[in-house]
């Protein structure tokens, strides 16, 4: 899925800082960025991360497992789990940071998750109006719906449907 583009640090624009603290007073923090190709060094957070892209693909290495995050799926990273990521092409990044308390109701292991149309719409709306910490009553209600959608998201073991071709089946087993 990745092209032959080779990342060279000298050609890279300045890296967006990896947050070391965010306002989780409401339990949720919404992050949205347009990211140029980059490599994000190994790090961990005290909060959980629901990572989603509206454009592009990001490769994440989480606890010894590799995940791809295309626009059809999100990747869940529990609190305090070391991870790093690479995006070889520009991406439109959306992330919901969840407090450790809220994260405790989500999977204990990193996993891919579905993104409902409702959740996608809320994350896009918050990006368009730059909501990071919901401030108004409508924003707080939307944030609660986003949380409900994250909690209800299906965990996905494989991004691709199983092959139907007899020629492909041996390669995928």
Language-model segments: residues:
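A generic beta-sheet turn/junction motif
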Residues: 46, 62-64, 89-91
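Short acidic-glycine-tyrosine-enriched beta hairpin
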Residues: 64-79
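Short beta-strand segments in beta-sandwich/barrel cores
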Residues: 40, 55-61, 74-75, 83
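Generic protein-terminus/edge-of-domain signal
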Residues: 1-57
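Double-stranded beta-helix
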Residues: 101-129
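Short histidine-centered beta-strand/loop micro-motifs
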Residues: 38-45, 85-88, 105-108, 135
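Ligand-binding loop in jelly-roll beta-barrel domains
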Residues: 80-110
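A short, Lys/Arg-enriched amphipathic alpha-helix from helix-turn-helix/homeodomain DNA-binding modules
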Residues: 138-173
């Amino acid at each position: 899925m990745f092209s032959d583009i080779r990342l060279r640090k000298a050609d890279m624009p300045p890296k967006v800082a990896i947050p070391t603290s965010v306002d989780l007073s409401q339990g949720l923090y919404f992050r949205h960025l347009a990211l140029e190709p980059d490599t994000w060094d190994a790090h961990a957070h005290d909060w959980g991360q629901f990572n989603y892209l509206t454009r592009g693909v990001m490769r994440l290495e989480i606890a010894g497992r590799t995940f791809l995050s295309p626009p059809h799926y999100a990747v869940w990273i529990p609190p305090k789990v070391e991870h790093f990521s690479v995006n070889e092409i520009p991406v439109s990044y959306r992330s919901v940071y969840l407090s450790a308390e809220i994260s405790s109701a989500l999977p204990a292991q990193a996993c891919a998750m579905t993104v409902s149309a409702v959740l996608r719409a809320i994350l896009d709306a918050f990006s368009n109006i730059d909501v990071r910490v919901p401030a108004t009553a409508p924003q707080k209600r939307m944030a609660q719906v986003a949380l409900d959608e994250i909690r209800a998201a299906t965990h996905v073991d494989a991004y691709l449907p199983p092959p139907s071709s007899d020629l492909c089946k041996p390669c995928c087993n």
